[in-house]
Design a protein with these regions (language model features):
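Acidic beta-strand-loop-alpha-helix segment within the catalytic core
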Residues: 1-72, 116, 121-132
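Short, glycine/charged-enriched secondary-structure capping and boundary segments
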Residues: 50-53, 78, 97-98
């Protein structure tokens, strides 16, 4: 996966031209402690407890609030370390971001942190999950 910058939307550059200025993901970013990305509109008690548990481990925690599947992409690019989701989502809410995350070497797991998220289930609801 790549992060593209400086692309003029009025031009139609080729993929080779775009890749010249692209940054391969994940980017190597130095963080102080753990950077957590969470939902602006779906902050739950479980999310707060998850973040509090990270803080109890003795590392400083920085919280970034963001909307939509951008949260998955922030982990994929290296701007955030982890994204816990303790609120309802559907497969279509996560599929595109999941593809980007996997290409960048990250993945989406059930909240246990071990079982990969699966698609094309009979019930299209996602379980609570974590991106890392």
């Amino acid at each position: 996966a790549y992060k593209f910058t400086g692309i003029d939307s009025s031009s139609q550059p080729s993929m080779d031209e775009m890749k010249q200025g692209a940054i391969h993901l994940p980017m190597a970013l130095a963080h102080q402690g753990i950077v957590v990305v969470a939902s602006r509109s779906h902050q739950t008690e479980e999310t707060t407890a998850f973040i509090d548990n990270l803080r109890k481990q003795g590392k400083p925690v920085t919280l970034i609030s963001s909307g939509s599947s951008l949260k998955i992409c922030l982990v994929a690019e290296g701007s955030a370390d982890i994204y816990p989701r303790f609120a309802p989502t559907m497969e279509w809410d996560t599929a595109a971001g999941h593809a980007i995350a996997k290409s960048a070497g990250c993945d989406i797991y059930h909240i246990d942190g071990k079982t990969p998220l699966r698609y094309n289930k009979e019930d299209l609801h996602n379980p609570w999950f974590i991106v890392k």
